[in-house]
């Protein structure tokens, strides 16, 4: 039986934003997952990811940042993004019946989650679906300082051809993070996990990435 998706809203302090729950029966954990800079929570990648990871007993809460709700292209100021993340996390925690709540997201969504956790948001773990370590063409300017303040388990799913994550940069950061971090490379994958010569739609890509994330989430929840 397919678990239904339930729509809701979250009050963020900058106005309500849309949200979507998928809660499979007997879920072992909740993963709050945020979209990347150029897409909203209903992008096929996000929807496919949430639907597929539910098959592994993981509930998900997806949500929009305010700029997406308003039809804008440019992301909100960092303070608004972080406040939205905190509101979404608290909403998830209040509805998870004591289950572990993890945080994560695609690119921007995952980066803001990591900043919130570094500053105290009590997630049980972090799942990065293409972490943006640096701007394309600027691997010398790595955005990693706050990662070393994080004490919960982290999973980095990264395409090896991602212009935001040169493999040598990823390896260096992971060495410094030590056992707190796990790395799952997607061979030939770009920032959207597309692999040249292997055409798939975004929903299928999201589903395949969920298969990589699910074992980590279940393990953090003590159900792996």
Regions found by a protein language model. Name each.
Residues 149-151, 156-158, 162, 186:
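Short beta-strand/loop motif that positions the catalytic acidic residue
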Residues 189, 197-224:
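Catalytic active-site module of serine/aspartate enzymes centered on a nucleophile-bearing elbow/loop
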Residues 46, 143, 152, 165-174:
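Short alpha-helix in the alpha/beta-hydrolase fold that links the catalytic acid
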């Amino acid at each position: 039986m397919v678990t239904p998706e339930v729509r809701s809203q979250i009050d963020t302090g900058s106005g309500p934003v849309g949200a979507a729950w998928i809660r499979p029966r007997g879920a072992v954990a909740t993963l709050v997952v945020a979209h990347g800079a150029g897409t909203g929570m209903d992008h096929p990648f996000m929807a496919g990811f949430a639907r597929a990871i539910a098959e592994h007993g993981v509930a998900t809460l997806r949500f929009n940042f305010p700029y997406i709700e308003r039809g804008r292209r440019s992301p909100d100021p960092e303070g608004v993004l972080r406040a939205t993340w905190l509101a979404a996390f608290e909403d998830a925690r209040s509805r998870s019946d004591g289950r572990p709540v993890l945080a994560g997201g695609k690119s921007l969504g995952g980066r803001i989650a990591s900043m919130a956790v570094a500053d105290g948001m009590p997630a049980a773990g972090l799942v990065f679906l293409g972490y943006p370590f640096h701007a394309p063409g600027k691997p010398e300017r790595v955005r990693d300082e706050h990662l070393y303040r994080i004490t919960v388990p982290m999973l980095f799913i990264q395409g090896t051809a991602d212009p935001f994550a040169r493999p040598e940069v990823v390896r260096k950061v992971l060495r410094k993070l030590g056992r707190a971090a796990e790395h799952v490379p997607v061979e030939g994958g770009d920032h959207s996990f597309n692999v040249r010569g292997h055409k798939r739609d975004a929903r299928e890509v999201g589903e395949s990435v969920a298969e990589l994330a699910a074992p980590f989430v279940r393990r953090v929840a003590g159900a792996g």
